[in-house]
Every structure is written in C-alpha cells, then in structure tokens.
Amino acid sequence: MKQFPRFFCFFLIVFGLFGQSGRPYVLLVSFDGFRAEYLDWYHTPNFDRLAQQGVKAESMKPVFITKTFPNHYSIATGMYADHHGLIANTFYDAEFDATYRIRDRSAVEDARWYGGEPIWCTAEKQGVKTASCFWVGSESKAGGCQPSVWKRYDHDYPFDARIDSVVAWFQKPPKTRPHLVLLYFHEPDAAGHVFGPNSDETETAVENMDSVMGAILDRVKNLPVYKQLNIIVVSDHGMAGINPKRIINLNDYTDLSGFTQEGTGPTSFLYGGETNRLHQVYADLKTAPHISVYLKTEIPNRLYYKNHYRIKDLLLIAHEGWSILNFKRPNPERYAGGDHGYDNVLPSMHAIFLADGPAFKNGYLRETFENVNIYPLIANILQLTPNTDIDGNLENIADILSKNKQ
C-alpha cells in the first residue's frame, strides 16, 4: 500500500499529459481582402495544395457590412455585426458619446466596444490556452478575457516574423502551448485597394501571399503537434473595382445641412437631422441612381443589420463599383482602384475558406456558407462547449468534417 500514492501520482501525471496531447490544435489564418475568385484567376499552387488535401468552399459569405473589423470579429464570435456591435471600421456610439476608429489604439483596446464572446475567450475560460497575432478584438478583453499570448498590431511586422511567432508558440512545452493560434495578414487587401482586383499588382500580391501560405505549410510539418494540427484559412471579404467616374454626389439630390455622414464609398450612414427632414431626405435620395436607400426600420432582414442601436437613421448602399462621396468634401479622384463594403450577396465581396487536418475530409468541395459558422466549427474541433448566444451553427457545415468529428 505504500506504493499506491506514488503510482497514483504517476497515473495522474500521465493522464493529464495524455488529455492535453489528445486535444487537437487549430491554426486560423486570415488573408485580408482575398476575393474568392482570386483562386481561379491567379496562380496559387499552395492554396490549391491545401484545397486538394482537405476542404475548399466555393466561397465564404461575409457578414454585412463587408468590412475588415466587423468580419474578423464575426469569424471570432459566430455573430452577425448587428449582434456583436462592431458595425463598421469607424462608427459613432451615442451612448458612449465616442467614436470607434481602427487606428485609435485606445478604442481598439477597449472591451466595451466588443459584444459577444470570441473563440479565444471561450477556450481560455475552459482552460485551453490560445494565442493571437493581430486578430481583431484580441488586443482588448472582449468577452472578459484575452488570449494567453497576443501581439499589438504592427502593420510593418514582417510576414516571415509572424510565421516565426506561430511556430514558436506551437513549440512551447505542453503546459503553456496554445491549442488555438490566430494569424492575420493585411494582403492582398492593400494592393486591391490601390490597384483594383483585376490588376497586375494585385495578381503579384496574391501570388506573394500564396508563397506565404506555402511557407506556413512547410514550417508546420516540423512541429511536434503537426499530426494533431488543423489549419483553417479564411479571408474577411472580397474586393470590387471602382473608378472616379462612377460616383454618387448626394448633394445633387437633396439638402443635407444639419445631417452627419458616417462612412463613404460603398456604404454610408446619415443621421442627426430633424425628424421631419429625415423623411424628405429619404424620399429625395430614393430617386438617385446606383444606390439603395433604407430607413433603419426598412433595412432588409437578410443583412442582419437593423436592430443594434449603433445603426443610424438612414443606410445608403452603393451598387457594385459605385462610390458615395463625402457630401461636405466631395472628391471623386480618391475613389479609384478597389473597395469593399458592398452588399454581401455579391460574389465580388465573397471570401475564401480552405481547411486541412485530421478533423477535415480530404479533397472535398462544398458550396458557399456564412462566416458565422467558423466559431462553432473551431469549438467542436477543440472539444469546447460553445457560447450558445451565436448566429452560427455547426450543422450548417458539419459535412466538411471527417466522420469521426461529425
């Protein structure tokens, strides 16, 4: 009997290590502005390799508004922007009497702007460590906590250094090793904005990111967790071509004195005017071509973008390729190259989804699905109990999982 305590302790240690090693790993990678059709238009052998080995969706439908911050946070939380509250890259909150801006460090790191529970918070609350390299929301205590390891956004941080960070995190000892790592790259979005989606420069950017994808695939092969690693590759939205001749000057159709405009380009809010004038402005703008105009109560249900108090009185959505000017400082020349923020039903706004690893089927192509389903997917793979207050549903994409994970 004297040997029992020692044996029992040994059993607990072995069982604990087995439990940790038995839990899968997930690497979630985002390539900003990677339009789904880029995989067909341009030479992408490494993305193709990932698709052939695992799963590829025809496209992934972003949430509206088709902007970077709302969609990255929807991927993280499984919620539409209307529910998590990050309704745009820049917006005013009347309750806070403050404006959220993606370049405002104090706002980005302030948890009060973020609703919902990000996947890293779900994991951390259940004792599963996570790490983030530049994912939207991870620099704040959104949902009540942060990843065990996270990096403050640095646009100039080299791509290879980002990969080095991921590799180093997965090489940590089991007790401190994250089971979920999130990684963000700002290309090919930057090239798409400047040069447009159908340009030589964007083609080069896509091919450069394909090389980055190849480097990731090659580097993870040497990781101790490789056989348990599931790689999920996404983007937040696509990109549409724009030019200065396809512009909408609101001043040509109505008098907006007394109104505040929030956002230009594909999408714009108007608010703050007198109530009786609001309906006149609405009626006036309904006559404008190349634009859809909605009172807040009339915003289509399919957009899931009408109930949050941060949504303003009037929503204007330009038709694909058209740009809404700033009515106080109209400057058509700035609207050239590419942009996003349009209706999320448009193929040009659709994102990519590819995945490979033991959790996924091999060589499987499936139809388009919404990005809010990523959260429950990752929760399932990591054996987590998901937040129930979400819009996504694992059943919507369970067909991509290997039989032992369904």
Model regions: which residues?
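Short, structured active-site-proximal loop/turn typified by the sulfatase FGly-forming signature C/S-X-P-X-R
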Residues: 40-84
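His/Asp/Glu-rich, glycine-adjacent segments
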Residues: 79-196
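Metal-dependent active-site segment of extracytoplasmic phospho-/sulfohydrolases and closely related
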Residues: 28, 46, 208-249
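A long, amphipathic alpha-helix that forms part
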Residues: 159-171, 188-229, 378
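Loop/turn elements at helix/coil->beta-strand transitions in domains of secreted/extracellular proteins
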Residues: 22-27, 53-57, 125-131, 175-181, ...
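Active-site neighborhoods of enzymes that stabilize oxyanions during catalysis
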Residues: 262-365, 369-377
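Structural recognition of the beta-strand scaffold that forms the well-ordered cores
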Residues: 26-30, 37, 58-61, 74-76, ...
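Bacterial Sec-dependent N-terminal signal peptides
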Residues: 1-24
